[in-house]
């Protein structure tokens, strides 16, 4: 009977040990395992979210870079257009200024020509009167002289 009683005592001790483990040891171990699983799952979710966020951020950065390049290209194109426009305006202004200077020079030449013609008329009239005086051997008074010069100038 010793064997039976020992076996029953061991079975009872084992049952108490199992009950004790199930009641006091097993729940904290299971809770720790569940918490660890939850932390691992949360970590994996966070890593997945971080990967998605990183991909999204990279896409946004690429899009912004593309937009910035397009804007820079537009600004450069506008600058080239404006520079060409300024060059054309400068050419037009220079051409107009040159034409204006040519017209001014032509006007001055015309005035000088008229002045020279008038002076030449006066000199020709004076020479004609001097020649006539010498031919006639007579002197004409100043008033008569002016009248003849004006008359000759009008005829010429």
Curated annotation (Swiss-Prot):
It comes from the Bacteria. One of its GO terms (molecular function) is proton-transporting ATP synthase activity, rotational mechanism. It is found in: Cell inner membrane. It is a single-pass membrane protein. Keywords: ATP synthesis, Cell inner membrane, Cell membrane, CF(0), Hydrogen ion transport, Ion transport, Membrane, Transmembrane, Transmembrane helix, Transport. One of its GO terms (cellular component) is plasma membrane. CDD domains: ATP-synt_Fo_b. The keyword Phosphoprotein does not apply. Pfam families: ATP-synt_B. F(1)F(0) ATP synthase produces ATP from ADP in the presence of a proton or sodium gradient. F-type ATPases consist of two structural domains, F(1) containing the extramembraneous catalytic core and F(0) containing the membrane proton channel, linked together by a central stalk and a peripheral stalk. During catalysis, ATP synthesis in the catalytic domain of F(1) is coupled via a rotary mechanism of the central stalk subunits to proton translocation. Belongs to the ATPase B chain family. This is ATP synthase subunit b. The lineage of its organism: Bacteria, Pseudomonadati, Pseudomonadota, Gammaproteobacteria, Oceanospirillales.
